[in-house]
Each structure stands twice: as structure tokens, then as C-alpha cells.
Amino acid sequence: MTTTISQRKNRAAGANPLQKFWRKRRGDILPPIFGILGFLLLWQLISSAGLIKLPPPSSLWTDPRTRTLLMYPFYDQGGLDKGLFWQTLASLGRVAQGYSLAAIVGISTGILVGTQPLLDKALDPIFQFLRMVAPLAWVPIALVALQQNQPAAIFVIFITSVWPILINTTEGVKQIPQDYINVRKVLRLSPQKFFFKILIPSALPYIFTGLRIAIGLAWLAIIAAEIVMSGIVGIGFFIWDAYQQNYISEIILAVFYIGAVGLLLDRGIAYLQKLIAPGQ
């Protein structure tokens, strides 16, 4: 009996790290997998029964054009004839530019407004008004003002995603505990030390909340903008072009790409928050 118990312990100690990970995380991994498979199965049954006119998920493989897009995401024939990897990458490039600009402007302006109550009262109605404007409403304004698709698309991303960053940063600065302000006065901290030791750490949870909301809005905005703007490489224009040619399976495939990339972007910001501000 003692030998058997000892052997079991040795086997457990020498278990494959992958097996340990599976035993630890299978409760988190299996439910989403079953949920996704159940959704796809239900969709397949409803489409096959003719209850909806959308093609079933199996059409992503049975349709020759969509199967080619699945198997060759990196193909590039020049112009607009590119695989979905390059279409998605082009959209992500625009998102990176517009979102980065929004983060810089939103955080810096939010800190300024949050530390100046009079400025906050003066500008908050403007911020709240502008953030209610839908991304598509900015597209014609951006095209008229900038005259080019690429700068107009970046502007639409910026103007859509800057508001949650700015407003959440402002709120985070305003929520700094009064005790911290008193400590600053007692210790006579310099503005630089107050900024890095008190203000930024206190406001970080609010800033990252704004950043997570903004990355989703930025991704939605570029899809909407590219659908309206013709003749540019991007996942949004790819969807519109497929719709014009009635390639519904291609639209569904692109929607899967959009959802997957959006999820990865959100998880990326959440992971960045854990690295920079663990435990907050």
C-alpha cells in the first residue's frame, strides 16, 4: 500500500505541465467551447431547415470562394485583391494610429480637466455632447475636411475613441481621496512627485477602463468607416464589396474575423492593465 501511494505521488509530481494546466483550467475552457459549438449547431439546423436565409456555418468551407479565403489568408494579387489577413492588418494599422492619438490626447486632457474644476464645468457639456455623435456621422465631415480616405478614417477612429478615455481619466483624477491631497500638502510634495506618486496610480483603474471601452469603439468605428469609404484595403470595405456582389458567406467569414480581433484587442488591454497596475 505504501509503495502504491508513493508511486502515485511520483507520477503526480512528474506530470506533464500541459496536463497540470488542463486539470486546473478545464472548468474555464470547456464551457465556452461547448457554448460556441452549441451556437454553431443551432445556426446550422435553423439554416438547413430554411427558417432563415443566411447560409449555415458549414458554407464557410463548402463555398469555394470562402474556402479559398480560409486556406489562403496571406494571398496578395495587388490593389484591393488581398487575403483577409492583409485586409484585417490594414484596418488594424488605422486603428493603431487613431487609437494611439486618442489615448495621448484623452489622458493628457483628462488629467488637465480633472485637476481644474472650473475647466471641467466649462468643457464637460461639450464632451458629453460630442461623445453622443455616432461614428458614421463623422465620416462625411472627415471626408469633406481632409479630402482623403486614409486621414479621414484615422480621424473617425480618434474622434470616436477619445471620449471614453478623456471622461474616465477626468473622473479618475477627481476621485483621488482627499487624504492623499492632505498628504501632499503636509509633505510639500513637488508637482512632479505628486503626479507620479499619487495622481497616476490613483487614476490608473479609471484610465484603463476608458482604454478598454475605447479600443472596442475604435474597432467598430473603422469597420463602419471603411464600409462607407470606397477603394481602400480593409475588412470593412471587404464586407461592403462582398455585399455588393452577394457573397454572403464571405461576409460571415469577415464577421468572424472582426469578432475574434475585437476580442483579442480587449484582452490585450486587460493584460496590459495587469502588467502595469496589478491588483487594481
UniProtKB/Swiss-Prot annotation:
Keywords per UniProt: Cell inner membrane, Cell membrane, Ion transport, Membrane, Transmembrane, Transmembrane helix, Transport
Membrane-spanning parts: 32-52, 99-119, 126-146, 153-173, 198-218, 219-239, 251-271
Residue ranges annotated for the ABC transmembrane type-1 domain, each copy included: 88-266
InterPro entries listed in its UniProt record: MetI-like, MetI-like_sf, NtrB
GO MF terms held by the record: nitrate transmembrane transporter activity
Membrane topology: Multi-pass membrane protein
PANTHER family reported in the protein's UniProt record: ALKANE SULFONATE ABC TRANSPORTER-RELATED, MEMBRANE SUBUNIT (PTHR30151), NITRATE IMPORT PERMEASE PROTEIN NRTB (PTHR30151:SF7)
NCBIfam families documented for this protein: ntrB
Physiological role: Part of the ABC transporter complex CmpABCD involved in bicarbonate transport. Probably responsible for the translocation of the substrate across the membrane.
Name assigned to this protein: Bicarbonate transport system permease protein CmpB
Gene: cmpB
